[in-house]
């Protein structure tokens, strides 16, 4: 067990069972959420307690296997080695409104999306809550930059690791921890409808970001296998339920793929499907993936598509490409390391 995956209430109960006074748990919790690498750094704890915790509950901080820093915009990409030798990626991005870290939720991915490097090799395992938290903490410590925003858009499908992701959100939002507001967190999903409904029940004030990437089943089936289980009509219906439960506008991710989903008819079909649903479209220049034959849309096609959506009443922005000189698209660094 890693103590960093426990809430303050759980940690208090655990240490009380071991005869420690109640205030000790808050001390330990605070140190853990500052990103200490050993209990020896917890200077306000008795030496005996530090030694015992070190023996019983090792902290297991991740190691930086590789780090790339963009010369263009300072975007920093990390390849972390976990305690079992598996590797995951996170990316620290600098914006005028603050620093955002994009984290992984799984080692590998089951979903098999055609345009994504993360899915090659399949799912190895799901991350523990502390392993997600560590990506935020140690990105912040290594860079010296305070993290104010988190996006769960790295390797893995967050809703496929539902319970651990919910615990991570609770921890990172904790006032005694990093205290990052839910409104500063975005969670991405390829469209696991039952889990979207579960998330809606929790009424969290985060941003749900749905990887849509197609206007209909015919196109989506060819690039996103998950669509065969949860067709686009079911997915949009779940998004409507989510909005009704949370009053939070849905963000739709849309990778612009030349000749696949970037036509005028595709834009018009999206407008019909989205009618009445408060939504924002994030148009994404497609990342190059070695094994994929898919090509990015031209700038002109992206601009035309954006205008069609906006003329139809949907807010659409073209995602700013960060770290293009370091190949900051997710999954690339891990794959190269595995080779």
Regions inferred by a protein language model and the residue ranges of each:
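Conserved alpha-helical substructure of the radical SAM core
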Residues: 120-149
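Conserved AdoMet/S-adenosylmethionine-binding subsite of the radical SAM
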Residues: 140-149, 154-316
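Auxiliary Fe-S-binding modules of radical SAM enzymes
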Residues: 1-88, 240-248, 254-339
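Short linear Ser/Thr-Pro motifs
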Residues: 70, 104-105, 118, 188, ...
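Canonical Radical SAM [4Fe-4S] cluster-binding loop centered on the CxxxCxxC motif
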Residues: 94-131
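Helix-turn-helix/homeodomain-like alpha-helical modules used for DNA recognition
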Residues: 78-104
């Amino acid at each position: 067990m890693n103590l960093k995956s426990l809430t303050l209430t759980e940690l208090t109960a655990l240490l009380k069972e071991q005869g420690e006074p109640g205030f000790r748990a808050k001390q330990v919790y605070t140190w853990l959420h500052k990103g200490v690498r050993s209990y020896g750094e917890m200077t306000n704890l008795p030496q005996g307690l530090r030694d015992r915790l070190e023996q019983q509950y090792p902290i297991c901080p991740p190691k930086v296997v590789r780090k790339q820093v963009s010369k263009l915009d300072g975007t920093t990409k990390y390849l972390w080695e976990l305690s079992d030798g598996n590797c995951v990626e996170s990316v620290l991005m600098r914006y005028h409104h603050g620093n955002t870290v994009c984290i992984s939720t799984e080692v590998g991915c089951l979903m098999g999306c055609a345009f994504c490097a993360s899915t090659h090799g399949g799912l190895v395992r799901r991350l523990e809550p502390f392993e997600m938290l560590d990506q935020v903490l140690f990105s912040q410590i290594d860079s010296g930059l305070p993290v104010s925003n988190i996006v769960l858009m790295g390797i893995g499908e967050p809703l496929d690791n539902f319970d651990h992701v919910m615990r991570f959100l609770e921890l990172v939002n904790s006032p005694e921890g990093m205290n990052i507001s839910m409104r500063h967190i975005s969670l991405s999903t390829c469209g696991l409808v039952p889990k979207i409904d579960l998330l809606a029940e929790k009424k969290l004030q985060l941003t749900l970001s749905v990887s849509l990437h197609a206007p209909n089943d015919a196109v989506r089936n060819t690039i996103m296998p998950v669509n065969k289980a949860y067709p686009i009509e079911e997915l949009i219906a779940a998004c409507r339920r989510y909005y009704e439960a949370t009053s939070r506008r849905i963000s739709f991710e849309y990778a612009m793929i030349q000749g696949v989903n970037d036509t005028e008819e595709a834009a018009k079909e999206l407008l019909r499907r989205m009618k009445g649903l408060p939504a924002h479209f994030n148009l994404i220049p497609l990342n190059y993936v070695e094994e994929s034959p898919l090509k990015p849309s031209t700038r002109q096609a992206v601009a035309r598509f954006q205008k069609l959506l906006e003329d139809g009443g949907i807010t659409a922005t073209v995602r700013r490409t960060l770290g293009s000189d370091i190949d900051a698209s997710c999954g690339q660094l891990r794959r190269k390391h595995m080779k």
